[in-house]
């Protein structure tokens, strides 16, 4: 038994690295694919188990299997200078401009690695395009990095198109004049080649001088019969060029690091930078002989070719999460802008901290598969910050450092296009699976409310409002409806969408304000969330229909003394004279707490209600500003009107008590007023009336 247990433990140790996520499999075709915690090869029943266990490879952690893989590197010290050296001055406005580019343009020193990898990718793309156009076979097209901590150097070498002596002078000797830019200019009508060229500014190479005491470049053009050359500079405004032997076709850059930048001669540090910025470069990328970019840029693939498990693993990668995406949108378009994107909605419900904290977008921005920003705050509006994913666009206007977006009409257009596409996607999902969408709205609805409140354009507010869901008086409890569906049910000639804010459906249906609306046989939306009222106040209208609170409708529709025209039997209602005398007495008792006391015949089960012009706005103002703490201050701000129901037993009894027991009658008036204020949501803390309630109970018990 002990022997079997030891064998089982040993087997578990061998399995553990393979069960980590995410994994990467080398499929028989040789092309690496992003795969789940165990590869499809490992999970497939027809695969050989021994082969399957060797297929998995992690991209987030170096494993023992990685170390056992044979190293592959083309970097070696074979170059030597031949003959004399010629000195040249930089052609772009002196050393001062070079200092600005090399020392002030970039916010982080580490981006020099990204820039040099991008340049190498461009060189390989140029060679690929040339050979394909000429019908020639493609050689090994690779990018290699090598670190040397002892010498304090980092080297990058590509097998791309290389440069002649003249190109070395023109491309590396002039700020903001790169071969990539010239190549694009020459291929304006060939979109495929143009779209794959990363560097367009010609300043990326000079980022090396942020960290370098000296930069050595060896390059040989892919043109037949080309010689190799060395380019050398310390960034002082002068560079040297000499013929060199032993130079391989392509370009090799050796950076001799400054004393305070030796960190970039560490393999671990460089690996982190490559993983951060250049994980999706199109060509094989090696660091000290080990393959780095084994992930696929699945956002560049055709959506129908990406499988669900690939989305799950890519979501975990970009979101740094362990759950699955609740929704996935793979969006590609070439008009009105070139966009390649994938968006995910996390399955995990956001916490209040996630909702309230001031965070920008969690969408990464790429330009031709090179990371520009890990959190691109300008690509999506702030209310969509719960979205995870990637946006890749060739049309994005970047500044010279390729780190900052240049706010422009194009960026605003991109933001609008993505926002509209996501809204359309959510609307489609709500129709496809209403129950799933209802859960999504329950978890993420606060973000949508924020979008409506913060949007400046009414059109945008109404677009976001299409995502809102509420219960309705016309539907069973728990069933949600949209504003569009409400509008479709409106009777001809109806202009308003009515809503009532309450903590729950029971309170909404027993509200005096809803009671007053039921007689109109009008559908009312029930809004239960704290910020619904503020949201609808900001929205104001939807589809040319005004959004009206039932409380406001009562005030506006009857903003004058209601005529006493009641056909109830005399025994069931106070007379007009009794009502007038009672209202006058109540005005005197309540004093400055009310602006007026008047009669209402819209109530049946409630004795009274308070009406305030724009009650929703007033309620929100009181809640946010925490003003009007006393009754007098509150009344001065709100100017409430108390409307009484002359048919209610409490009002009829009050009329009798005001003559026979004025003390008890005054307590009842105060309580009726407080009850109406509570029903209106205008009392923050009802504990102040506990003493009066106790006194009323004592007086009630004195009669028994």
UniProtKB/Swiss-Prot annotation:
Its main location: mitochondrion. GO terms for molecular function: ATP binding; ATP hydrolysis activity; ATP-dependent protein folding chaperone; protein kinase binding; RNA binding; tumor necrosis factor receptor binding; unfolded protein binding. Keywords: Acetylation, ATP-binding, Chaperone, Membrane, Mitochondrion, Mitochondrion inner membrane, Nucleotide-binding, Phosphoprotein, Transit peptide. It holds the Pfam family HATPase_c_3. One of its GO terms (cellular component) is mitochondrial intermembrane space. The modification Phosphothreonine is found at residues 174, 494. InterPro entries: HATPase_C_sf (IPR036890), HSP90_C (IPR037196), Hsp90_fam (IPR001404), Hsp90_N (IPR020575), Ribosomal_Su5_D2-typ_SF (IPR020568). ATP binds at residues 119, 158, 171, 205, 402. One of its GO terms (biological process) is negative regulation of intrinsic apoptotic signaling pathway in response to hydrogen peroxide. Residues 1-59 form a transit peptide. Found in skeletal muscle, liver, heart, brain, kidney, pancreas, lung, placenta and bladder. Expression is highly reduced in bladder cancer and renal cell carcinoma specimens compared to healthy tissues, but it is increased in other type of tumors. CDD domains: HATPase_Hsp90-like. Transmembrane segments: none annotated. The modification Phosphoserine is found at residues 170, 194, 568. It is found in: Mitochondrion; Mitochondrion inner membrane; Mitochondrion matrix. Chaperone that expresses an ATPase activity. Involved in maintaining mitochondrial function and polarization, downstream of PINK1 and mitochondrial complex I. Is a negative regulator of mitochondrial respiration able to modulate the balance between oxidative phosphorylation and aerobic glycolysis. The impact of TRAP1 on mitochondrial respiration is probably mediated by modulation of mitochondrial SRC and inhibition of SDHA. Belongs to the heat shock protein 90 family. PANTHER family: HEAT SHOCK PROTEIN 90 FAMILY MEMBER (PTHR11528). Binds to the intracellular domain of tumor necrosis factor type 1 receptor. Binds to RB1. Interacts with SRC. Interacts with SDHA. This is Heat shock protein 75 kDa, mitochondrial. The gene is TRAP1.
């Amino acid at each position: 038994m002990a022997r079997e247990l030891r064998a089982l433990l040993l087997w578990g140790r061998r399995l553990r690295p393979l069960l980590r996520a995410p994994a990467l499999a080398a499929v028989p075709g040789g092309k690496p694919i992003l795969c789940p915690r165990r590869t499809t090869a490992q999970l497939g029943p027809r695969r050989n188990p021994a082969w399957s266990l060797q297929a998995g490879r992690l991209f987030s952690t170096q494993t023992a299997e990685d170390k056992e893989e044979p190293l592959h590197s083309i970097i070696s010290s074979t170059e030597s200078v031949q003959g004399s050296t010629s000195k040249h001055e930089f052609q772009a406005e002196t050393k001062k401009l070079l200092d600005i580019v090399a020392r002030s343009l970039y916010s982080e020193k580490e981006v020099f690695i990204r820039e040099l990898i991008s340049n190498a990718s461009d060189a390989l793309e140029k060679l690929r395009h040339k050979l394909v156009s000429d019908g020639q076979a493609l050689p090994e097209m690779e990018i290699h990095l090598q670190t040397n901590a002892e010498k304090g150097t980092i080297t990058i070498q590509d097998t791309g198109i290389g440069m002649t002596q003249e190109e070395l002078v023109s491309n590396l000797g002039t700020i903001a004049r790169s071969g990539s830019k010239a190549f694009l200019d020459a291929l304006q009508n060939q979109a495929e080649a143009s779209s794959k060229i990363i560097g367009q500014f010609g300043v990326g190479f000079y980022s090396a001088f942020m960290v370098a005491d000296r930069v050595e470049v060896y390059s040989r053009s892919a043109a037949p019969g080309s010689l190799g050359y060395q380019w050398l500079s310390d960034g002082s405004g002068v560079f040297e060029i000499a013929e060199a032997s032993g130079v391989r076709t392509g370009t090799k850059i050796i950076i001799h690091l400054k004393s305070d930048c030796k960190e970039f001669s560490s393999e671990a540090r460089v690996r982190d930078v490559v993983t951060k910025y250049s994980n999706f470069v199109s060509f094989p990328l090696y660091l000290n002989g080990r393959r780095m970019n084994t992930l696929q840029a699945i956002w560049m693939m055709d959506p129908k070719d990406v499988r669900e498990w690939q989305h799950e693993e890519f979501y975990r990668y970009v979101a740094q999460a362990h759950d699955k995406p609740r929704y996935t949108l793979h969006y590609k378009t070439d008009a009105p802008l070139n966009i390649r994107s994938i968006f995910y909605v996390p399955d995990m419900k956001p916490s209040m901290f996630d909702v309230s904290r001031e965070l920008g977008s969690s969408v990464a921005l790429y330009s031709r598969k090179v990371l520009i920003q890990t959190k691109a705050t300008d690509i999506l509006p702030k209310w969509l910050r719960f979205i995870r994913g990637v946006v890749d666009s060739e049309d994005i206007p970047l500044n010279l450092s390729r780190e900052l977006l240049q706010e422009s009409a194009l960026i605003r257009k991109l933001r609008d296009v993505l926002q509209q596409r996501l809204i359309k996607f959510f609307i489609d999902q709500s129709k496809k699976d209403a129950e799933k969408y209802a859960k999504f709205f329950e978890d993420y609805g606060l973000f949508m409310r924020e979008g409506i409140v913060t949007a400046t354009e009414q059109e945008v507010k109404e677009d976001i409002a299409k995502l809102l869901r509420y219960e309705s008086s016309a539907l069973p409890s728990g069933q949600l409806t949209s504003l569009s569906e409400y509008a479709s049910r409106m009777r001809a000639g109806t202009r308003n969408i009515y809503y009532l804010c309450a903590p729950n459906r029971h309170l909404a249906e027993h509200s005096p304000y809803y009671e007053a609306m039921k007689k109109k046989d009008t559908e009312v939306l029930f809004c239960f969330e704290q910020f619904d009222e503020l949201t609808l106040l900001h929205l104001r209208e939807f589809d040319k229909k005004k959004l009206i609170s039932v409380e406001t409708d009562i005030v506006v529709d009857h903003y004058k003394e209601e005529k006493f025209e009641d056909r109830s039997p005399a025994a069931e209602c106070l007379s007009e004279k009794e009502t007038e005398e009672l209202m006058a007495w109540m005005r005197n008792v309540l004093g400055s707490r009310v602006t007026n006391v008047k009669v209402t015949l819209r109530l049946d089960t409630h004795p009274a209600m308070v009406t305030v012009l724009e009650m929703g706005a007033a309620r929100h103002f009181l809640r946010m500003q925490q003003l009007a703490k006393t009754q007098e201050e509150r009344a001065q701000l709100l100017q409430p009107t108390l409307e009484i129901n002359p048919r209610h037993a409490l009002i009829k009894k009050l009329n009798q008590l005001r003559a026979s027991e004025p003390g008890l009658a005054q307590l009842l008036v105060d309580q009726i007023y407080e009850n109406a204020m509570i029903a209106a949501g205008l009392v923050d803390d009802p504990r102040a009336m506990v003493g009066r309630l106790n006194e009323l109970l004592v007086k009630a018990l004195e009669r028994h």
